[in-house]
C-alpha cells in the first residue's frame, strides 16, 4: 500500500534477528530466529521492500543485551546473519553490530556479506567517520570502544547522549574547538588519557605542544587496564 500511495518512497525494513546467549537462551526477545528471518526476508522482497537492515532484535528492557558492551559479543557479530540473508534476496542488505573500524567495514562489503554498513555508537565517537574514509583518512577515525557509558547508560538513565571518547558530543553548541587568539608553547606533563586529550585540543587550537612522559609508553592508567580482562578490545 505504501508503494501505491508514495511510489518513490524507499522502504527499508529492519530484520530483527535473535542471537545466542548461552545454552538454550537468546538475546532479543520478540525477534526472529535465523530460519524464520530467511523466509520473511524473501516475503518482504516480494512485497516491494527496497532494502533490508539486519540487526540484533531489541524488544527488551535490557539495552545491554541488544547494544552489547565490550567483550560481550564478538566484533561484527551480525555479519554472518546478513551474509545468509544477502544470499537469499536481490535487494540491498545492510548490517550493524560492533563494526567499529573502516577496515572491518570494508571487509564486510568486500566479502559480500552486506551492501551497506550501519553505524550507531561509532558515529557518537566520531561523527566524521564516513567523511574521513571518503577523504582517504581512515587512519584518523576515532574508534568506539563499546563501553556503553555515555550512550546506552545515559539513555537508560533518561539523560542526553554523550561519549567518553568524544567530549564534544552533546555539547556541540558550547564546546567547539576554535583557533586561539594567540599561539603559545604548551608543555603537557604526563601522556595519560587526560594529557593526550589536552595536547590534542591545544594543537587543534593552533598551539605548539610538547608532551613529557616519564615512562617508555604513552597511555597512563590505560596500560593497567590492558593487562586485565578483554585485552583484545580496542582502546
What are the residue ranges of the model-derived segments?
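Residue-level detector of conserved catalytic or cofactor/ligand-binding positions
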Residues: 229-235
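Flavin-dependent oxidoreductase catalytic cores
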Residues: 1-189, 193-209, 217, 223
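Conserved acidic E/D residue at the C-terminus of a beta-strand in Rossmann-like folds
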Residues: 211-216, 233
Amino acid at each position: 500500500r505504501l508503494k501505491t500511495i508514495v511510489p518513490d518512497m524507499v522502504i527499508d525494513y529492519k530484520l530483527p534477528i535473535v542471537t545466542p546467549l548461552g545454552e538454550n537462551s537468546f538475546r532479543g526477545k520478540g525477534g526472529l530466529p535465523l530460519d524464520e528471518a530467511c523466509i520473511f526476508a524473501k516475503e518482504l522482497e516480494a512485497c516491494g521492500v527496497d532494502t533490508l537492515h539486519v540487526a540484533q532484535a531489541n524488544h527488551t528492557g535490557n539495552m545491554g543485551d541488544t547494544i552489547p558492551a565490550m567483550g560481550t559479543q564478538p566484533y561484527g557479530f551480525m555479519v554472518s546473519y546478513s551474509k545468509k540473508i544477502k544470499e537469499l534476496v536481490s535487494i540491498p542488505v545492510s548490517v550493524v553490530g560492533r563494526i567499529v573500524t573502516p577496515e572491518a567495514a570494508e571487509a564486510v562489503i568486500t566479502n559480500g556479506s552486506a551492501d551497506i554498513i550501519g553505524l550507531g555508537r561509532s558515529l557518537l565517537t566520531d561523527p566524521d567517520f564516513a567523511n574521513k574514509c571518503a577523504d582517504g583518512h581512515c587512519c584518523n577515525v576515532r574508534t568506539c570502544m563499546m563501553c556503553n557509558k555515555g550512550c546506552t547508560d545515559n539513555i537508560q538513565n533518561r539523560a542526553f547522549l554523550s561519549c567518553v571518547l568524544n567530549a564534544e558530543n552533546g555539547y556541540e553548541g558550547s564546546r567547539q574547538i576554535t583557533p586561539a587568539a594567540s599561539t603559545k608553547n604548551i608543555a603537557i606533563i604526563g601522556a595519560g588519557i587526560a594529557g593526550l586529550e589536552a595536547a590534542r585540543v591545544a594543537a587543534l587550537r593552533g598551539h605548539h605542544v610538547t608532551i613529557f612522559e616519564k615512562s617508555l609508553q604513552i597511555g597512563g592508567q590505560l596500560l593497567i587496564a590492558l593487562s586485565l580482562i578483554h585485552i583484545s578490545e580496542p582502546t
